[in-house]
């Protein structure tokens, strides 16, 4: 009687609101009254799959979410830490490393400009139960987070314990990010004005930008001295860019309705495309191109597209079942494709029938992974997956199979066929594919610049190289025979000349 459902559509999702169980204090008068508010305890989709949130009943994390069970039955443990725990951990690490402990306060200010702060942070997420792999759970967290002494997110580590993101913050303004980095990539830095607005974005291996703010106007200048001006209208969440002055002096414009939905766009040549959003849903019901030709779109009461008519008058139609699943699609040429389902709790089809009467069938795992595919000739392909959902084997007819291996970061490292022929793959720290080793031992490689753009590729002993400008555009290509091709661009990055 004290649990509630909330939804904005009969098809869901439904929000389950209730209260979390807690252990009463020793001197508390029982029965304790119910709290005056409800908290989110679960989320149910239209197929009955429930994501359940488990909250701590007692202790320093009482009322906090410390576990999640997804709709497939997997359980995840959310490891929370307090500021005091993180401070103690930092001190212990300093002692074990023989270094001087850094300043790490045991408490944080209770309130910030963003609201109340209890100092609790998410430090790791573990998979603790998997119905498909109950005896093969990961021995490490799926993701781990590091925090600064001021409670700011400092680093993100993936399941291999590799740091994949890092963040740096302003010494004076808590929570103001001044730099961030992806693993293997240069650090991008930011500068701010007194109002907390970004005035500079500094990219050491690419374009940098400056931002100048005026009333209803923002000027953006890159390190090639190209300038764009954004003209805005509206306030807060309804502020929109209504005019854009491009680096070549051309102007494009946009119009919006009273609630901020796009109504029209005018290109640099003065040609206007009009959009007609539905008053209630905001879905586009009509698009009229500059030449006056129109496309129309129609939806059901669940906001699903039921038909679309193009400027040529041809119509595409769709039908759905009571669960909102697509069951039939009629192409503009009249061809009909039907979709069939054998499980009321799944949105994945078990079969498709095309206009020729040919049928393809599929089976799926509880996690939505394709297990088998049978084509219209009756040939069956089977797929094996690991606990992370990656394909580990593909089995085709006549005993032909292909096996995939991955490293701890989830990167494909090897592909082997039934005869034992193996192709191996190597990567750099950023995750770029650097080497492909064929079954005969031959190697093909690629070298990259700081931003991950290929600067040199070698295949069969032949090398091709590329040079880029600060904007990341190819300006010189040297082919395998040593010939050169150069490229020039205009201020809008359009190719205007190719020589070679």
Language model features with spans:
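Extended charged/polar low-complexity repeat regions
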Residues: 1-500
């Amino acid at each position: 009687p004290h649990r509630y459902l909330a939804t904005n559509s009969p098809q869901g999702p439904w929000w389950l609101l209730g209260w979390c169980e807690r252990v009463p204090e020793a001197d508390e008068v029982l029965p304790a009254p119910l709290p005056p508010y409800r908290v989110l305890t679960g989320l149910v989709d239209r197929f009955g799959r429930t994501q359940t949130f488990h909250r701590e009943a007692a202790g320093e994390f009482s009322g906090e979410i410390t576990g999640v069970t997804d709709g497939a039955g997997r359980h995840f443990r959310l490891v929370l830490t307090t500021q005091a725990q993180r401070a103690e951990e930092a001190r212990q690490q300093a002692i074990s490393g023989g270094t001087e402990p850094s300043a790490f306060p045991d408490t944080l200010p209770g309130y910030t400009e963003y609201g109340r702060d209890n100092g609790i942070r998410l430090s790791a997420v573990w998979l603790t139960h998997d119905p498909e792999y109950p005896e093969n759970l990961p021995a490490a967290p799926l993701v781990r987070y590091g925090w600064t002494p001021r409670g700011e997110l400092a680093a993100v580590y993936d399941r291999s314990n590799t740091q994949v993101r890092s963040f740096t913050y302003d010494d004076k303004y808590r929570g103001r990010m001044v730099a961030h980095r992806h693993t293997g990539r240069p650090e991008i830095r930011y500068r701010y004005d007194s109002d907390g607005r970004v005035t500079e974005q500094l990219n050491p291996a690419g374009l940098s930008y400056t931002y100048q703010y005026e009333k209803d106007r923002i000027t953006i200048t890159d390190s090639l001295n190209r300038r764009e001006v954004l003209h805005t209208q509206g306030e807060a969440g309804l502020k929109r860019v209504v005019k854009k002055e491009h680096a070549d002096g051309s102007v494009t414009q946009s119009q919006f309705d009273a609630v901020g939905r796009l109504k029209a766009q005018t290109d640099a040549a003065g040609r206007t495309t009009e959009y007609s959003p539905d008053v209630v849903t905001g879905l586009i019901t009509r698009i009229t191109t500059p030449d006056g030709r129109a496309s129309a779109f129609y939806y059901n009461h669940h906001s699903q597209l039921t038909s679309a008519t193009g400027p040529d008058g041809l119509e595409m139609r769709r039908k759905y079942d009571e669960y909102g699943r697509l069951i039939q699609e009629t192409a503009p040429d009249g061809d009909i494709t039907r979709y069939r389902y054998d499980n009321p709790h799944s949105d994945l089809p078990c079969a498709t029938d095309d206009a020729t009467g040919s049928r393809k069938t599929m089976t799926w795992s509880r996690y939505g992974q394709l297990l088998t595919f049978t084509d219209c000739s009756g040939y069956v392909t089977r797929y094996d997956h690991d606990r992370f959902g990656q394909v580990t084997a593909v089995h085709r007819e006549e005993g032909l199979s292909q096996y995939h291996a991955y490293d701890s970061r989830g990167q494909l490292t090897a592909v082997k066929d039934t005869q034992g022929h193996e192709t191996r793959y190597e990567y750099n720290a950023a995750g770029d594919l650097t080497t492909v080793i064929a079954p005969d031992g031959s190697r093909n490689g690629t070298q990259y610049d700081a931003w991950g753009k290929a600067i040199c590729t070698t295949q069969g002993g032949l090398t091709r190289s590329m040079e880029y400008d600060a904007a990341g555009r190819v300006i010189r290509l040297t082919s395998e025979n040593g010939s050169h091709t150069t490229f020039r661009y205009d201020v809008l990055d359009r190719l205007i000349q190719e020589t070679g």
